[in-house]
């Protein structure tokens, strides 16, 4: 499950995933963008590999490239989108309160992430989390929204 609950939205990096997935928009709206990888140097490329030793993915520099927008589409409630592990994409124009639920297949590939040209592997690290009490409140609010449908 993914909840976009902030008043401001940071544009996602262009990225792929380590596994195929299918997502359904439960509430809200977003734009799903698909990209092609092309020769160039404006974006730093990183491979995300799962490191068994540390128990999480790590970023490995992978040169420089360009990402060329192939298509965009606006998706709303009850719409579904699927991506194979190696498809480059991101989402944009996400409505606050958007909730998606995803089903993931088994990890099969390294993920690819494209960042600004001067990015380094450390720029790919993000610590995220939520206190258990806040998580309970968020999940209860989502449950109420689903029940009200």
Give, region by region, the residue ranges found by the protein language model.
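Short acidic-glycine-tyrosine-enriched beta hairpin
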Residues: 36-86
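Non-heme Fe(II)/2-oxoglutarate
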Residues: 105-149
């Amino acid at each position: 499950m993914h909840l976009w609950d902030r008043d401001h939205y940071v544009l996602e990096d262009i990225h792929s995933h380590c596994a195929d997935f299918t997502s359904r928009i439960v509430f809200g709206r977003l734009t799903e963008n698909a990209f092609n990888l092309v020769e160039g140097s404006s974006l730093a490329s990183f491979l995300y590999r799962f490191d068994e030793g540390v128990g999480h993915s790590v970023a490995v520099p992978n040169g420089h490239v360009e990402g060329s927008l192939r298509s965009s589409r606006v998706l709303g409630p009850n719409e579904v989108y699927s991506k194979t592990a190696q498809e480059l994409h991101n989402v944009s124009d996400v409505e606050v309160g958007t909730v998606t639920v995803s089903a993931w297949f088994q990890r099969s590939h390294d993920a690819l992430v494209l960042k600004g040209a001067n990015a380094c592997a450390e720029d790919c690290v993000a610590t995220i989390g939520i206190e258990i009490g806040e998580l309970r409140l968020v999940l209860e609010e989502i449950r109420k929204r689903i029940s009200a449908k």
